[in-house]
Amino acid sequence: MRQIMIAVAIAVAVSILLTPALIRLFTKQGFGHQIREDGPPSHHSKRGTPSMGGVAILAGIWAGYFGTHLAGLAFDGEGITASGLLVLGLATSLGGVGFLDDLIKLRRSRNLGLNKTAKTVGQITSAVLFAVLVLQFRNPAGLAPASAELSYVREIATVTLTPALFVLFCVLVVSAWSNAVNFTDGLDGLAAGCMAMVTGAYVLITFWQDHNACVTAPGLGCYNVRDPLDLALIAAATAGACIGFLWWNAAPAKIFMGDTGSLALGGIIAGLSVTSRTEILAVVLGALFVAEITSVVLQILTFRTTGRRVFRMAPFHHHFELVGWAETTVIIRFWLLTAITCGLGVALFYGEWLAAIGA
């Protein structure tokens, strides 16, 4: 627990202190966010707000994770693990794709950055590298950072994927989560606040897995997860970085995370869900993100097949703005929904453990 608190503290400090420096730098460079002309009228006043704040979030995550391990040398903490590095690497790789996208938008003063093909190739490449590496690096107990078995709270033994199918599965998971968080990042503080809660839930889940790991505590209900404590540090650092960034990103936002932040954060959820064996449970924890990307898919499919729209605008947080909800009302209600789904997800996780031990 001490390591988790250190990770949160370092990440919050780095993010909250670095963000205003980025605001000044990007403002001086003229790196202002471009607003869609067909968006809600209330958003036009945000034109010119600095973007690429995701740099501060990634810096906070890196500092929180590696800073905690450096501090751990003083009290014999666990070392850096393959699982932690793979999740961090996935997030950083996706953040790099987002950074290029943001940079093109800002340099060309338009709302379109990388073309869809280039962006998709970047996401797929990141996912494939992660998928291939995450089944390697077995520890002395024979555990790899991930399993080829589909997982809810632990592996579902009846659903085992071939290596090729596992790679395809990871591509779908990474693409879905990175785009889901990207679509959600359309209102001040919405994505950062929701991410802080989802990763906070993952801190609880992975910390519990660490205390009930089959390697150290074999018995009913134990978890075959490699490096759960290190995954908890990644989750804690992410939550802390989002909280620090939210100080400046809350309405009215002084800076936006941009694709640099949203794609990286989506990678965090994808990476944590695969390495903690909770791919299906993640859908409950991040249900708001799932709803956002689903609204976009429904809007596109319905319009192409019927010529009609389900929502006034997608992602559907904009729909609520256009029907009269104030932006802050949408944000707070979506935060509340995320808190509920995170609570439900943690309850399902703990309930499964109780059932496993026969309680």
UniProtKB/Swiss-Prot annotation:
Membrane topology (UniProt): Multi-pass membrane protein
Cofactor dependency: Mg(2+)
Catalytic activity from the UniProt record: UDP-N-acetyl-alpha-D-muramoyl-L-alanyl-gamma-D-glutamyl-meso-2,6-diaminopimeloyl-D-alanyl-D-alanine + di-trans,octa-cis-undecaprenyl phosphate = di-trans,octa-cis-undecaprenyl diphospho-N-acetyl-alpha-D-muramoyl-L-alanyl-D-glutamyl-meso-2,6-diaminopimeloyl-D-alanyl-D-alanine + UMP
Biological or metabolic pathway of the protein: Cell wall biogenesis; peptidoglycan biosynthesis
Subcellular location field: Cell inner membrane
Pfam families in the cross-refs: Glycos_transf_4, MraY_sig1
InterPro entries, sorted: Glycosyl_transferase_4, PNAcMuramoyl-5peptid_Trfase, PNAcMuramoyl-5peptid_Trfase_CS
A GO cellular-component term linked to this record: plasma membrane
Entry function: Catalyzes the initial step of the lipid cycle reactions in the biosynthesis of the cell wall peptidoglycan: transfers peptidoglycan precursor phospho-MurNAc-pentapeptide from UDP-MurNAc-pentapeptide onto the lipid carrier undecaprenyl phosphate, yielding undecaprenyl-pyrophosphoryl-MurNAc-pentapeptide, known as lipid I.
Protein's UniProt name: Phospho-N-acetylmuramoyl-pentapeptide-transferase
Species for this entry: Mycobacterium marinum (strain ATCC BAA-535 / M)
GN (gene name): mraY
